[in-house]
């Protein structure tokens, strides 16, 4: 009887020491069903699944929802005195991307890498060339920590605002009625700085969201603005079977109730043959008015919502967790107490890299899942335009060939100008496949600030959290090795390093036996005491002590086993 690979791989004795990588190709799910891993996470250790609502459970349709927000913000600006001509602008989804930085001094939209190096710079609709950029940023670099000047437009809600800033700067720079200045524009004796304009836009956006008609118009036509996924009840019900599920949203109860009712307004329950269930039944805890990111710090008073009126009941809620109660405010500490969970027991799923992901990880140690809707298009370009990526690799090979037989004694200077021009052209074509500002994650070979934040703070990420449906709850999401250039560009072949070729070859940490006392005495110039230290040398670990992956650590399992043994005694 033959044994399948699946059976053999579950028996430590049958595991092969090594294998030809072509003999057993690693299984990967379809790209659009994948969950991508920055830090290893064992799903069986997760006891609570937490969700944000806006752009997570409720995905707003693009560009319809951004267009609505854009139009309402423009109307608000015109109502406070901005020119009527602005009403002619229409939201263009091909221009903005998330993660751009607005320079409130010069009015520029800037795409930067993790260190503040400028990748793309646009003044209005004008994409600035290198010389133009260097006139305002001599080193093509910005100080990102200067938050008074530089504002990061990181969220999906920022997309209409990003495009509106470009529209305004372009309008006031090119309209004949206004005189353009380096830091703003003039209308006769009136001067408006880009900083003041930016603050007006920020105030208008806040007004539209909190006092205006954005939510009202969204609710009036939910099919137009909100994506409904029939798989949502199924995933939440499966999560209910293995742990607790909670909702934490900054939205108020009335809006939350209308959105969630629409999402679960299906003719069936979790399965096609099951009866319909109200949305509240899928959650062990529902919390509105969270005021994230404040929620992950000191928080606010925990109140109870009267679900009949939507108003808050007086007094602070001090009771235990009760199914069906809707809470308002509170903090992540209070939530953990109600759920009986600690930091790493919780997987929190959200779209806001600062309000949801960064703060929940840094302040509470929650495991994090970032929803990135743009990832669907990024993957499409990555696969559909593979010929462009392959051409860039070929150009790298051509470049290496030109320098192949040259060293520091060579006077020959190969003409690489044609290859450089081609690299720039292919890179530009590749960037334009994503949109005018290029990819959300990179510009050419360099990763963006947004990409670095995703890698730093999100344990998992995907285009949609629904992709968790395609993984068992016992799954180990194991992070791939992050290779440095000396690892990714050097093949796994034995290389002999001779001391004559490289004096650095003597810096070998494993070949010499430093435990030889004679070797040590030979190098000592001071006298040796007859009284010896308890340990002359460190001992090589005989067991696995180095924590390579966050969820590879077996200490927690050992502690749980010890606790179970104590309880049995």
Swiss-Prot record:
Catalytic residues in the record: 52, 54
Cofactor(s) demanded: Mg(2+)
Region Required for tetramer assembly, annotated ranges: 548-569
Any one GO biological process: GMP metabolic process
Residues given in the record as ATP binding sites: 144, 154, 453, 456
Catalytic activity, EC: 3.1.3.5, 3.1.3.99, 2.7.1.77
Catalytically driven reaction(s): a ribonucleoside 5'-phosphate + H2O = a ribonucleoside + phosphate; a 2'-deoxyribonucleoside + a ribonucleoside 5'-phosphate = a ribonucleoside + a 2'-deoxyribonucleoside 5'-phosphate; IMP + H2O = inosine + phosphate; GMP + H2O = guanosine + phosphate
Region Disordered: start-end pairs: 530-569
Function: Broad specificity cytosolic 5'-nucleotidase that catalyzes the dephosphorylation of 6-hydroxypurine nucleoside 5'-monophosphates. In addition, possesses a phosphotransferase activity by which it can transfer a phosphate from a donor nucleoside monophosphate to an acceptor nucleoside, preferably inosine, deoxyinosine and guanosine. Has the highest activities for IMP and GMP followed by dIMP, dGMP and XMP. Could also catalyze the transfer of phosphates from pyrimidine monophosphates but with lower efficiency.
UniProt cross-references to PANTHER family, sorted A to Z: 5'-NUCLEOTIDASE DOMAIN-CONTAINING, CYTOSOLIC PURINE 5'-NUCLEOTIDASE
UniProt-recorded name of the protein: Cytosolic purine 5'-nucleotidase
